[in-house]
Amino acid sequence: MDIATNFITRSLSEIAPNASQSSLHVTPSSVSNNAFGLKLRQLISDTYCPHIFIMASDDTENFMKRKGFDDFASFIRPFGDRIFQSSTNNSAISKETLDSRIFDNDHDSIRFVPMEAVQVPRQWKRNKAWNTENGLENCANSRFAPGGDIDSFRVLSQKLIEEWVQSGSNNYPENGFLNPILDYLKLLLSGNPVAEHETFSHPVGCLIVITSHNTNPMATVMRLFKEINNAPFPNFISKEILHYYLFIHDEDNNDLSNSKQIFQQMRRSLGANSHFIRLRSNYISAKPLDTDRYDTSSIQSLKNAPRDSMESESFCSSSDDAKPITFVTKNLRKFPIPEWRSSLEVQAESEQSCLPLYPLLPVEEVEGMKKFVQTMLYDSIYPFMQRCVRAWEEDLTPQYGNLTTRLLFASKKYWSRNHSSHSQGNYDPLSLIYSSEKQESIKRKMADFSFMLRDYKRAYEIYDEIRNTFSQDKAWNYLASCEEIQIICLLMQNRNISLKSQISYLNKWFDEMVYIYAVRLHSFYYTFRSVLVTSLLLSLKPAFSIDFAASWLAKILEPGPISLNPFETSFLNTTIAGMYSNKEHVGVTDGNRRRKAAFWFAYSAGFWRDCGHCKMAEICWNLANRVYSKSGWESLSEHMLDLKPTLSENFRVKNTFH
């Protein structure tokens, strides 16, 4: 016990002076160029991206069913995960967006979701239960399910770590736990739930889709347009969105010249936000799968089979009048599985009686869809968002302009409140929202648009302007969300920042954010998400900012804010070790960094053992012992050797029994 106490005291005593010193000497560049930092920044950019709702005609949905998909939203969804810009798209991107890109493989993302996606996880569960009771569940691809469901996340996160442990050997690298941290964070952030206090999951645009099978295309388009305007969205979601139109030509059953003529008529009426694409309606499957019911082994064989091993004569149409289809094997690709599936969706899919089958697609269709999504994003979505930001800035200048205009507005607001006892501001304390047409809601949307456009500096300034308004109105959910994204904005900026001047503000915003999310709103998801994201981003900054990041993450490990289960406690302790194990961290001496990583690995080993993950406990012990066995501290080395037998499964079972 004395050795352990001495060990902890000595390790923590090294952190304290370094943390205090960091607020005085932080001048290097704040840009993190190591592999973990690049992946984390890309992950954050992919999380907070524009959402596009799908409104497809009946003929489109029938076309997709013949092609092997549940609906058009399921078909287009994975093509929005990774969108790479071409040289012709640069003119549509602002200088701030280009400056925020820090590596060659940087990409953008958009989320394609069905119209019914505007619902919270609780509502989605109720609808799913009702469908199950009424026999409406089927074996088709899982529909979109929102994120934020903690129960399903906890189940899948444990499976994620177990798979990582089983996939490796005992010789894990020092920074080997960084990849599981990213996978865990991606699972947490997938399916960003619809919320009133942030507009990232609110629709930026809507894609209206019809096919060449439609007998009255213009009338159908106008009907779908009216349905969008009359959709029962919550009043905190604005319907001022971009409308984009897609015409699908059936390559197998319709005349191309006739389809092009119809599309040109549509384009003259609807404008430039229209696109024409050619797709085949035949569902391409392999003979072993051409049965009435697809079994799991056949599905897995298709998913895992190398493309070169498939012969062209094994493919046929799945329609009733099945005919051989001539395809060259090298011109076929597996349909990409969506990367950003929420834990609720993954769990629902695993509970189905049969797994979804992702068909094969001709390479021309895959490339055509990629080109369409790229054109839509860079030529329409981004320019639309930029125009919105400029228009909102002009409209809101009287309230959020220079110092003089803001003082005049503040005095007017003060006197109007004094002379009107019924004035309650724009915030509704009963429904806890600002309606979409209110200035505060527009300002928040303007900041979120700037963030999604990667103009982090401007977004930070806007969040800073509206934070005081949320505080005065006691709009706690808006205030906490504003502080969360404001911290992320500051840490995502591709420029030098001085932690000497910023750390006091960061700590204040962080503490208030955690208090509101955990105590006032009792939201485990938002508390956990905000702490994990901001801590990991802060750990990338130079010098000893990593010590502040560790202290942030350690705050939710203390009893009080939120109730963590044993697995989450073990994971977060190991995450702190993983942050210190980042070899390419700037400004921290290698020996100091490795000792702190070893301390947290050793500290978390016991937690892993107690929650039944003895293999993880052994991995953490090995990573810590690599450092301590060479430390020259004989008593500590002996303590580590004495600790190893206590991490075994037999010791845990015996200790539990007693």
Swiss-Prot record:
Main location: Golgi
A UniProt-annotated Pfam family: TRAPPC-Trs85
UniProt KW keywords: ER-Golgi transport, Golgi apparatus, Meiosis, Transport
One Gene Ontology term from the biological process aspect of the record: vesicle-mediated transport
Superkingdom to which the source organism belongs: Eukaryota
GO cellular component, one term: nucleus
SS bond list: none
Family of this protein: Belongs to the TRS85 family.
Protein task: Component of the TRAPP I and TRAPP II complexes. TRAPP I plays a key role in the late stages of endoplasmic reticulum to Golgi traffic. TRAPP II seems to play a role in intra-Golgi transport. Has a role late in meiosis following DNA replication.
Subunit field text: Part of the multisubunit TRAPP (transport protein particle) complexes I and II.
Name used for this protein in its record: Transport protein particle subunit trs85-1
The gene coding this protein: trs85-1
